Structures are given as structure tokens and as C-alpha cells.
Amino acid sequence: MVGGLPNSSLWNIEYDDLVFKDIIGKGNFGCVYRGNYLGVEVAIKQIPSFDDPDYCKYTEREVKALRYIRHPFVVHFFGACKHESGFYLITEFIEGLDLRRYLKSVPKPPKWLSRVNIALGVAKTFLFLHSKNLLHRDLKSKNILLDISRNQIKLCDFGFARVGSQYSNGSDSSSSEDESDSECVNGAAGGGGDDVYKNNGNGKPANYRLRRMSICGTPSFMPPEILLQQKYDWSVDVFSFGILCTELITLKRPGKDYWVRSQNNGFDINIEELNVNIPSPNDCPIQFYDLALKCCSYKHTNRPMFSTIVTILESIKLQLELFENQQQQQQLQQQQQLQQQQQQQQQQQQQQQQQLQLQQQQSSESSSSSSSQPLVNNNNNNSNCNNNNFNNSSNNNNSIANNDSISNVSTTTTSIPTTTTTTTTTTTTTNNITAINGTSNKYLQPLSKHQQQQQRNQNSSIIDNNSLIGSSNTESMITSFSISTFKERKKQSLNKLIRANTINILIGQQQQQQQQQQQQQQQQQDNQSSSQNQLIEREGVIKLDTTKYPNGWKEFGIDNSTNKIWIIYQSNIIKIGSNNNNNLIEMTCGTIIKLKKHSITLSIVDSNLISGANIINVKSYLKDYPYVNKPIKVNQQQQQQQQIITNNYELNLIIKLQSRIRGWLVRRRYKIFLSNWKLNNSNTSQSNKNQWIRLFNQLISSELEYKKQLDQVIKSYLLPIQSKFRINKPLLNYKEIGSIFSNIESLSEIHNELLKIVNQISKSPFFIMNFENEKDDRSNQNNTSATTDIFGDSSIQFTNISINTKDSSNQINSITQFIVKNISQIKNQYGIYAFNFKYSTNIYNWCRLNPDFSIFCDTIRSQLNQQFPDQENDLASLLSLPINKIQKYLLVFEKLAQITPITHSEYKDIKSAFTLIRETSNYIQSQLEMSFEHSHIMSIDIMLQKKDNQSLMQSGRWFIRQGQFTELSSNKQYYLFLLSDICLITKPIKSKSSKYNNNNNINTNNNNNNLTSSATQTNSNKDLSTSINQSTSNANSDNSGNNNNNLINSKYYYRLKTIINLKEEVSMRINPDISNGVLFIGPNKTYKWLLPNDEEAKDWVNDFERTTILIYRNNPNGGGSNNNSIGGGGGGRGGSGNNSNNGSIDLTEINQIHHINNQAIPLSSSNNNITNNNSINNNIIMNNNNNNNKDTEGKGFIKRFRLSFSAGTSTPERKTSLVNMSPSTTSSLNNIDSNYNNNNNNVTNTPIKSVTSSPSIHYTPVNDNNQQPQLPSQPNEEFQFTVPTTPSDKKKKRGSFSSKLKRLSITFSKD
């Protein structure tokens, strides 16, 4: 029975009852099918490799979590099925997309109410899970399914869920971590332990013991504490929820589109980057935005609990619902008003039709009666005239009825007080007649044709507007752009009314006179009347919202000095296009009558600007719109030029002439290119041509091979190690991964782009020289064979493709152009890799001391050897390939620059590429030298386990010595790192190994012997790397054997205990009470230590005294401060002292101090000097022993300093590295040194920041002008960095079980 499943058959499902359909998803652990189980649609998750313990562990957790969870927002669990084809989990099938695909596929951004509902559903789900002490640890948008039918979310994928959270009574058997660490086994309720673990997920105090949790989840949704491998609690789900909220806000993918986190800032987030990625318009609720940022707080204590999150989201949801209800009510009111307006208009139209019919009848009757009555006397002239006028009006009415156009009715009633009488003036446009003082028919006159047509246009526009104004597009435009609305004043001013009355009276009199004139005068009269009718002005008011515009009209640039303004408004006239309806944005001019702070009264003439129109913007008349037509003076020359340009014939002639010239230039260049490669009688040109083609073929073939090797490093080594790190079975931590592989992924991307360029330009005639105009069949055959050698396919036919000369400046047409345009990126990335190379080699050899990593590397190497037997498939060999790549480029382009003719099209590019590659090669060589200088401290920084993340790298600090010590009183093992200004006292801790960690009988005699032998070789001044190479080769042979039981985990970390600042009163001397013992006198404590032999004890004392003397020389007035931080202390070579000559070291002083302190000459000395110095040193050792027993015994630091100062002092020498380097690495470095000596130019050793691939480690070596660490005299000179050896296997009886678990041992030097 699978662990986690109940013994009853309730959760067991038979395989025959399952019906599999199509695949609906894929994940890290298997596929998900859509299926059927006993007539119910289900989702079937297949786990094929169920025998793997990791898969079993996570499957057991998922089953255990789903079996007991019953929540409407969690997928329902039906059961599990075990079969030969794999293990299957059967859950509820959700008809819908996951949240990630939904946000990606939605055509329009979803409403904020729906987004808040999704977030609220997730928060309620996690509030329930945390109340049951269950951590999900994999909250992301892909694990949230949207149930469309029920309009709710469903949470799935409980593979990383932790039942019982980190607080358990021991019943959770799924823990894969070491639970016996004394720092983690503390009762949360009892007060011991970290503050992180005092409460459960629901905020209540925890009562059970603490359990360390593993590292799992999706990196883009993981909080910083998980990525930094620190302790974490329930707040990790809150951080993931905050990332999910930002995804709902931006509708983009975190970790890809924004917030690509790195360890530069401790995996923190950037708020400015979030603000940039929010789509416009940014109408996100402020409370929702603040909640997302608060959940993404860097400190876990600042993140809220899900109970608080649910409360905030419910308040946001309530506000959004109220807002939407108000909008819906406003829309309903607008629709009702529109309907009422339409009904009123329909009634008015019906009334107008009835009136027209009555008038037609009356006109017909009056015409018949007038025709029957003869004209007898003059008294009836007025009536006849009136009848004629009325007949004219009836004719006009008949024409209106035939055209089916109905006029609008607008009535304005005002009272005009006078001294004698009170008259009522009404103005109507009914029946196309202008009536003044409606009680009398004296001034009844028909409208002109122009006025009738204008009224028809207005009426038709209003009718069309009323029929289409209810569309959603119009409402959205009104609500989104309008600043105010225009309201027409019902009561016009007295002056306006008088002006209108007088104008209308004059119009009526003129019309009566003009009717008796000819038809030519009638047209002039219509134009005058229409122009005068346009002079009728209307008054209106525009008011601003005081809350939106507190400064009033000043925000629009309008003040008391402004007389006229431009009014930009949304016209109610609808422009009906062929496909859609578009609102018109129009602009008119208005005169200011009265100006207040938030309101403006103006007069307008535009008839389209009616009451209720939306005002989009208001601007000053002259300031903001200077494009008003003004007279422009044009010179005669300008007029002539315009005439020439506007002449189409001459313009076409110029275009044809230019095209002919461009074509002639291209053909000429092509012929010159052909002539450069014509076969001549001389063998020199033919040999150069063949050599040119052969070099390019060699360059492309080597590029393909190099790219294949980089892919092997990434796919065979890097990706499997990263995948094991993600599934909680790490071979290395993220710092070690970044240290070993550096930025090799960036290098692979650069060469991938280069291969794309090669494939694109491979068909170009300028690249292969396969021309159609070439008549030499033999040359065509040679070119075809050349392409076959490059791409391995003789069937490929290369055609003649001409190069576009217009885009030649922006298009990359050759390999040399790619290198020239991308040389800065190549220089940067290869410089980073070279700076980290030595440091990467140290970390790789240290990590191979772990059997798990060693077996993994050997297994991958054996698999690659079977596939590629002719290549070097070892990881160390593959990592050394990029170091020589630029040197290979340099050799190829140096030869190409010599044999390429000057008239060749690529000659300039090849020449410039050669120059840039040479500069890049020198720069990489300088970075490689600096890597030897700083690699030791960088390696120590990775091996240390310290509380803070402060780096050891500092200007003027270098490595001196390291070694193992045993404390006499407690028999504890310590490890010391002596640097130029500080001393690190550490405690070794064995790394974890899944298969070989239980081997308690660690044989350390061999390691001690190696330590002794290496110490003796140091005194004899032999190559220290040979002994280490022999020991690592033996270790490799043991690791590659079939007997894995003999493997020993020799990889140790170093927990930092104390940092001793050498500026303080510290000293080290021989312990006279015991052999091989030293006394380390610190500022607060005296240590009694034991070393493996007497010679090593003397070496430690001498190196320590020289270091302290050098610090005193550089800082003669500076007493040590009580600063024990890693960055404390500034002494060392090139340190900042008061004397300008402190950084200079005399060679005689170096020799004297070496003789006094029993130390050999540095490695740069010859063998003869070494033998002589050894004989001298043997005599001085006896004298120094006597002096130590007699003279210096009991003397303080100042006396010993004076004794040494009389003979001169110098810095302790930097020793060669004892880290094992593979033969390929050594050979590659030797090749680089030989090439560098040939191409030695003046290069500034400018350090660059080490930017490695993610996960990565960053080091920034300091290169000050005043404080420059001295580089070695030779390019390939190495410094001594010994791999720490295994401590002695002296055991001490422990009183308790927990204290036995604290026993740690250390090793370093076996590969």
C-alpha cells in the first residue's frame, strides 16, 4: 500500500474503471489526462517513475493533503490507483483555464471586481489551510483553476504541501531534512527557538517541536528566505499571494516580464519596476495595490495574515460593487431619459404632420376661393397680397412635405417691460415661418431655401443622434474624456433679445421687398439673410467640478485677460460609416461674457453645440492654437522651388535617375568583387583564395564544435544539478552552482546568435563565392565542396542572393560584422568568465570531495564518453574551453588580415575585427591574472558559514596561510585562515551526503600524512601542486571504482566563530610546555593549540609575526580598534599608511626577513638559490630555537618587533595553490600564457564585476590607484591556497546524544 493512503478500499480505484482521454496539462512529475471514472468527468494525474523516492515523497504529501481537505475552493479528491504503467491520482475535473492562461488569452482586461473576487477566493482558501496548519508552498497562477460554471476558483497541485506545517509531534513521516540539529530542535512555546516559529499559520502559539523544512516551490513566486536557504514559516504563502496579486494588477508573468530577481539585492523586489509594468489607464484600487506590496515585504514579520487579507479584500469588493451599482443606475437613468426624449420627438413629429395636413387643406381652399374672386377695387390689394404670400408659404410647405423633412420646434418666451405697454415676443419656426408678436400676422414671412436646408440638416442630425446615442461606445467616450457639460441659458439677456428682434424685423422687410425683384436678386437676398441669420448668438454656461479642478479655469490657461476661447466638444451628430459609427469631435469659438473661478458664461454661434453636449477641453484662442490662417509672405525663389517640386513629371524623372545611379554603383561593386578573385597565372592569388576559404571553413566548423561542447556543459551538467536543487535533492547549493558554472549560459547565447548569423549569410555569394556569372566550372565545384565541408550536406544548393545596399548599415552581412558590432558584449562576458575561472576551479575541486557530486560527475562523463569517445567530456576540461576561445579567434583573424586583399569588400571589417579581438584577448589575460590574485579569498568566502552576507573581498587584503588546529583542553578541532589583516577562527562542519554520511569511521591518517608530506615539501621548496594532484588522482580512481562503500565524504564547510583583527594586541608563539604546540594570545582570550608537527608550528609563528609587523609598519600610529567585522582592518600590501613608502618593498629586506623567519625564497628564485637558502635556514632554525628559549621568552610584542625590525621586514609571500587542477586546465593556462607573451601590450588591469549566471555569486575586486594589490611577476604564477585537510580522528566522549551529533570533521583536499 502506498504511504499516505488509508487501509480501507474507499480511496482505492481500479485501473479498469478509468477511461483516458486527451492530455490537458504537463508538469514536473507527469502528465494530466482528461478522463472518466464511473460516469463522472475527472482529471487523472499520471506519475510514471513512482519508484523514485523523491516522487514517492511528494506524491505521499499530495495524497495526504487532498484526502482530508474538504473545501469548496479546493479540487475534490476521488482516490488513487497503482498500476504497472505508473501511479495515478484522480481528482475533480474543472471546465476552464488556469489563471495564467486566462490572463494571457483574455482580449480585454477583466474588471477589477472580478480580479478582486479571484484574490478573495484564494485568500479564503489559504485561511482555511493555515488554520489546519498546512503549508502549500507552491502558490502560483498555474495552480489556480477557474470554474466558469460556478464562477469560483479551485486550488490544485498539493505536491509541495506540508501537512502539519513545521510544527509537528513527530507523526509527519515525510520530512527529508536533518531534524537533529541543535539549533532547530527548540520548543516554540518554551521560549527557545527563533521568532519565526513562535506562531502557527492562523496566528496562534505553537506547542509542538520545530521541524526544519526543505527548499521547494517556483523561483519567481518564492520568498527571499527560501532562496537564501533560511528558516521560513507560514508567511511564504503570503509572499506568493502578493506576487499573484501583482500578476492580477499587471496581467504579466512575474519572473519573466518583470521582477526577474537575483541575489544582487538579496532576491528583493523593485517597486518602480512594478509601476512601469502596470497597463494604462492605471485605475487599480489603491487599497489592492498597497495590499499586494505589503504581502511582498522582504521581512516575513511585516507580511499580514490571511485573516487580515480577507477582511481588506472584502472591503475592497464592497466598494467596487457599490461603484458598479451606481454606474448601472446612471446608465438606466440615461436610457430612460433618451427614451422619453424619443417619445417626445415622436409626438412632436405627429403634431407637425397633422398641422401640415391642415395647412395644405387650408391652402388648397384659399387658392380655390381666391381664384373665384376677381380683383375689383384697390381695397382688396392687401388681402390679395397676403393671399399670395400665403400661397407661397403653402407651396413651400408642400415641398417640405414631399421631401419628408420635419422641422424642430423651439419656443423661447420672455417679457419685455416698456413705459407704456407690455408685449410678449415669441419666436417659432413651425411650418417654416418666422413669427414675431404672434398675435398679428403682419410679419409672417416664409423662410428662404438656404434656411430650409439648414433646418433639415439640424433636424436629421438630432433624430439620428437620438436613435444612436444609447450605444456603449458613446457612453464610454463621454465618461472617459469629458471635463464638463454645456448648458444653454433659458433666459437670454435683454440686449440679445432686442438684437434678435430687430434683426428678424429687418429680415422680414427685406424679404417682402426682394420677392418683387428678379430671380438674380433673389439669390443675393438668400445669401444675405442666411449670413444675417448666422449672426444670431446663444448664451451658455460651462461649470467645472471643484474637487477635480481646485484651481478652476487657471488649469486651462484662462484668466481675466482672455476674451475668446476654443471649445472642443463631442457633437451629437453621428457620422455613419460603412462598418461602424463614430462620434465626431468638433471645435468652435466662443466669446466670454462672464468668468468665475469654476464657471464661465459665454456666447456661441455654432448650432451643433446644444445643451447637454460633453465638453472635452477648453483652451485660449490665440496661445494654444497659433495655426489660425494668417497671411504668409512667400519669396519668388520659394515659389519657383515649389513649382519645380510639384511638377510630377520632373519629380518622377529625378527618382528614375537616382535608381539608375544606385543600380550602376551596385553592379560596379559586384564586378570589383569578382575581379579580386579571378584566377590569374600567379599561384599566389590562388593559394590565398584557397587559404581564405579554408580559414573561414575552419572558423565555422570550430564554432559548431564549440557550441556543441557548451551545450553539453549546460544540458548534461548544469541543468540536472539545478533540477536536483529544485526538487529538494541538491548536490550543490545555489552559490556553489553559480561559482562553478559562472556565466557559461550567457556565452552559449552569444554563440547561438553567431550560428544564426552563419546560417543566414551562408547562402550569400559574398560568403561562398558561388556566382551565376562565374563561367569557370572548376571554381563552382570547389565552392560546392567547400559548402559541403561546412554543413555536411552536398544536396544544399546555394543561390545568388544579392545584398540590400540600403540596409547594409543596419544589417549584419558577415561573421566579421557580427564580431565588430557585438565585441563589447563578448569582451564583457568572457572577461567575467576569465576573472572567475581560477575561483571556479577551486570550488569545483572542493565540491568533488563530496561523493554524491563526484559520482554524478563520473557518471555523466562515462555516458558522454560512450557517445563522444573522441572528445574531452570531463567537466573541468569543458569549463576550460572558453578561456582559449578568444585566442583561437585571434590566430584566425590575424591570418585573414594578412591574406585578404585591400579591395575586398570585407577587408575593413576583418581588419577592425582583428584589432578588437586583440584588445579583448589582452583584457581577458589581465582578468585571468587578477583571478589568481583574488580567487583564494573568494573561495574561502563560499566555504564559510557566517551569519551576515558580508564579503571577505577588500582592497589591500590577500591570503597568507591556513591550517588545522586542535585545542588542548577540549580536544576540539579548529581551522584558521590567516589573511593580511585579519585571522578567521572557524569550526569544520561536514557537508551532507545521502549515501555516505553514516560512515562514522573516517580514516584520516592518510590525510594527515599528506599534510606532513606537503609541509616537508614546503620547506624544500618543491612544487606543492604535485602532491595534491597525486592525492586527488588517487581519490578519483577510488571514486570511479565499482566499490562505492569505500567512498568518504571529505567536503567540509567552516562555521565562523571569531574574527581577530591583527591591528589589536595579538601574538602567536611556540608553547614551551608541549611539543608541536602554539600559544595564540588574543585581545580577550588565550588559545592553546596543537599542530601536526613542530615545523608547521614554527611556520605559523613566523608568518603570523611577519604579518603583524607589516601591519604595524603601514599603520605606525594606529592602534587596533575593537572591530571584529569581516570588513575591518585595512593593513596589507599597498595599505593606506601615513608614509608614502610603506607600499614599496626592498629586495634585500625580503631576503633578510626570509632568513630571520626560517622561510625559503619565493618560487620565482632558481634552484641553486633554493638549495643554498635551505642550508642557511637549517642553521638559523637552531639559532632561532635557542633565541626563542632564552632571549625572546617572556618578551612582548614591541620587543620582538624591534628585534625583527633591525633586520628589515617584508610582506609574507603569497604561496602557490595546492588546489588540484586537471591536466586540461593546466595546459589551457599554459597556452594562454604563451600567447600572451607573444602579444604583450600595455593593458590596464581594470577589474570587472563578476556577474555569473543565476544563481550566481558577485565579486567586485577593488583596483584603486592608491591601493593596488601587487600582481605576480609572471602571468602564470600561482598563489598557495591549500585545500583544508581532514582533522585528526581523536574522539572525545560525549555526555548526551545531542552533543554526539554536534561532532563534525573536516576535509578539503581530496578530489
UniProtKB/Swiss-Prot annotation:
Comp. bias regions, Low complexity: 451-471, 994-1021, 1031-1044, 1230-1245, 1263-1276
Compositional bias annotation for Gly residues: 1117-1137
Pfam family, one: PK_Tyr_Ser-Thr
Biased composition (Basic residues): 1290-1303
Catalysed reaction equations from the record: L-seryl-[protein] + ATP = O-phospho-L-seryl-[protein] + ADP + H(+); L-threonyl-[protein] + ATP = O-phospho-L-threonyl-[protein] + ADP + H(+)
All copies of domain Protein kinase, residue ranges: 18-316
Biological process annotations from GO: signal transduction
One function term, GO molecular function aspect: guanyl-nucleotide exchange factor activity
Amino acid composition bias (Polar residues), ranges on this chain: 1208-1229, 1246-1257, 1277-1287
Chain ranges of the DH domain: 691-927
Family classification: Belongs to the protein kinase superfamily. TKL Ser/Thr protein kinase family.
Protein name: Kinase and exchange factor for Rac A
Organism field: Dictyostelium discoideum
Classification of source organism: Eukaryota, Amoebozoa, Evosea, Eumycetozoa, Dictyostelia
